[in-house]
Swiss-Prot record:
InterPro entries: DHBP_synth_RibB-like_a/b_dom, DHBP_synthase_RibB. Its cofactor is Mg(2+); Mn(2+). Catalyzes the conversion of D-ribulose 5-phosphate to formate and 3,4-dihydroxy-2-butanone 4-phosphate. Pathway: Cofactor biosynthesis; riboflavin biosynthesis; 2-hydroxy-3-oxobutyl phosphate from D-ribulose 5-phosphate: step 1/1. The keyword Transferase does not apply. Binds 2 divalent metal cations per subunit. Magnesium or manganese. Pfam families: DHBP_synthase. Mg(2+) 2 binds at E38, H153. One of its GO terms (molecular function) is manganese ion binding. This is 3,4-dihydroxy-2-butanone 4-phosphate synthase. Keywords: Lyase, Magnesium, Manganese, Metal-binding, Riboflavin biosynthesis. One of its GO terms (biological process) is riboflavin biosynthetic process. Belongs to the DHBP synthase family.
Length: 222
């Protein structure tokens, strides 16, 4: 690390590096949103390696709406239409139609079935016919510019996977409290300590990417 960098930036870069190391090891990370935006934390795992126990954790401890963040190119290759033609969502979250694996699942609801659907969708050789609609996994289309274009969890997920050298796809779900309310920052850190997940913010990822651009480093690939 450059010792001349401001302390705050160094801290942000270190947080991202810890998260990338965890993702490379197939572990999860918690990404917090800006307090002035959605003000929530999402639990994120690499799509290429997500396990049944990890999926069960997402279903049990989070909102249950498990999303699969993918690039625009991947969404197009799977011929997934957007959920609505006119997106009136306040944050322009780009949902496509929901999906289910065409083979190898039963009702599609179980953790094992959802992992099968994710693995099917992100396979390099995946075809549109490999998926059925509707289903219990909700794909999200990331903007090409990542968090520098849209500072959302969808873009943060794809950016993190690329920065980690993984396939640019990840699963996420919003962290909730036992009473069903959204987890705040204190609950997020408590959950992090309990499960050993690194915590970082979308702002940290923005700072990391801007630092790469300033130094000319190649952190993202198509």
């Amino acid at each position: 690390m450059n010792q001349m960098l401001p302390e705050q930036l160094l801290n942000q870069l270190n947080l991202v590096e810890k998260a990338l190391a965890a993702l490379r090891n197939g572990q999860g990370v918690l990404v917090a949103d800006d307090p002035g935006r959605e003000n929530e934390a999402d639990l994120i795992f690499p799509a290429e390696s997500v396990t049944i126990p990890q999926m069960a954790l997402l279903i049990r401890e989070c909102s249950g709406i498990v999303c699969l963040c993918m690039t625009d190119g991947k969404i197009r290759s799977l011929e997934l239409p957007m959920m609505v033609e006119n997106n009136t969502s306040g944050f322009q979250t780009a949902f496509t139609v929901s999906i289910e694996a065409a083979e190898g699942v039963t009702t599609g609801v179980s953790a094992a079935d959802r992992v099968k659907t994710v693995r099917t969708a992100v396979s390099e050789n995946a075809r549109p016919s490999d998926l059925r609609h509707p289903g219990h996994i909700f794909p999200l289309r990331a903007r090409p510019g990542g968090v520098l274009e849209r500072p959302g969890h969808t873009e943060a997920t794809v950016d993190l996977m690329r920065l980690a050298g993984l396939s640019p796809a990840g699963v996420l779900c919003e962290l909730t409290n036992p009473d069903g309310s959204m987890a705040g920052i204190e609950e997020t850190f408590a959950f992090s300590v309990q499960h050993g997940f690194p915590v970082l913010s979308i702002g940290d990822i923005v700072a990391y990417r801007k630092s790469l651009l300033q130094t000319g480093s190649q952190g993202l690939s198509a």
